[in-house]
Amino acid sequence: MAGNRSNDIKVHCSFCGKSQDEVKKIIAGNNVFICNECVALSQEIIKEELAEEVLADLTEVPKPKELLEILNQYVIGQERAKRALSVAVYNHYKRISFTESRDDDDVDLQKSNILMIGPTGSGKTFLAQTLAKSLNVPFAIADATSLTEAGYVGEDVENILLKLIQAADYNVERAERGIIYVDEIDKIAKKGENVSITRDVSGEGVQQALLKIIEGTVASVPPQGGRKHPNQEMIQIDTKNILFIVGGAFDGIEEIVKQRLGEKIIGFGQNSRKIDDNASYMQEIIAEDIQKFGLIPEFIGRLPVVAALEQLNTEDLIRILTEPRNALVKQYQALLSYDGVELEFEKGALEAIAGRAIERKTGARGLRSIIEETMLDIMFEVPSQEEVIKVRITKEAVEGQSKPILEIA
């Protein structure tokens, strides 16, 4: 309620002491008054304190070995990729802390965004999520295939930033130190090395648009998403300290690597090194191969850290099912334990689940759906069968040849 200037008694701000005649407005509370100037000042103080809290958090970033230990609790395999990510993430946040306190003549540390290359279900998204969670920073996921360059029907790249701002509860200072994971980046590769003379709505044009926010810019983001409109209020966000991790399967890139290494299959009758079809060339990938695949040189240059993930084998998938803190087997065992029922997966069952995931080429992300198929009837029936004390999942149950074995009290 504003003070009434027609009254003889003047109202004064309880904080700065200014009268109602010296300020634009005074708000009355329970025996307390505050002027518009003190409201604005308090908002500025809160904003600065929030920013200081964000910076304070960054001074306690785990060391690379500590980050690796955290990743090992949740992510099986991919040792080289986990090491590369741990070092890159640590250096990124160390750079932010250094930049905030450096002198003008100090070394200017460049941002090291990350490119993850690996088959579907190898753990790219999960690695990025786990890192963000362990650092307690805002995290957003975007799909590159939904993006188009400005002026075309589709999603503007700025909407990626809106997702991060929303993940930070609209605290822009926190969002400016968050992590964004852009998936399916290989799907916006050019169709060839030569620049096309036609418009490339979802390829090179999107790479150019992403390039601007990845390398660092002050972007204007519509608060409600969608396209920008004249006279629309915008959120300003500086992307120079946002860590961008982009990932994709890059199907066929190993053939490009083989060609570069001189191991391309040569016609009949000619001498050539024999190719080991079971060998992986993922760790041999260099920038030249990625450019040949279809990413533009400027875009590759902003992704100096390349983490290659291998195809997960049967042993890896079994470990994923059983070892991590949030392993699927542990989750289902916990669910049935709430009904007083013990759940056991035989070794053959685990091998069958892993084998199905490999057959379907879904990797780790396909494990849950396979277990759901196997467990559906059990999860439906057992809670009503009080006499059941244990459920045993066999290989035959996974393959649909028989039902799981129930043990009765």
Swiss-Prot record:
It comes from the Bacteria. GO terms for cellular component: HslUV protease complex. Component of the ClpX-ClpP complex. Forms a hexameric ring that, in the presence of ATP, binds to fourteen ClpP subunits assembled into a disk-like structure with a central cavity, resembling the structure of eukaryotic proteasomes. InterPro entries: AAA+_ATPase (IPR003593), ATP-dep_Clp_protease_ClpX (IPR050052), ATPase_AAA_core (IPR003959), Clp_ATPase_C (IPR019489), Clp_protease_ATP-bd_su_ClpX (IPR004487), ClpX_bact (IPR046425), P-loop_NTPase (IPR027417), Znf_CppX_C4 (IPR010603). Keywords: ATP-binding, Chaperone, Metal-binding, Nucleotide-binding, Zinc. It comes from Streptococcus equi subsp. zooepidemicus (strain H70). This is ATP-dependent Clp protease ATP-binding subunit ClpX. PROSITE patterns: CLPX_ZB. GO terms for molecular function: ATP binding; ATP hydrolysis activity; ATP-dependent protein folding chaperone; protein dimerization activity; unfolded protein binding; zinc ion binding. The keyword Zinc applies. Zn(2+) binds at residues 13, 16, 35, 38. NCBIfam families: clpX, PRK05342.1. It holds the Pfam family AAA_2. CDD domains: RecA-like_ClpX. The keyword Nucleotide-binding applies. Residues 1-54 form the ClpX-type ZB domain. Belongs to the ClpX chaperone family. One of its GO terms (biological process) is cell division. ATP binds at residues 119-126. ATP-dependent specificity component of the Clp protease. It directs the protease to specific substrates. Can perform chaperone functions in the absence of ClpP.
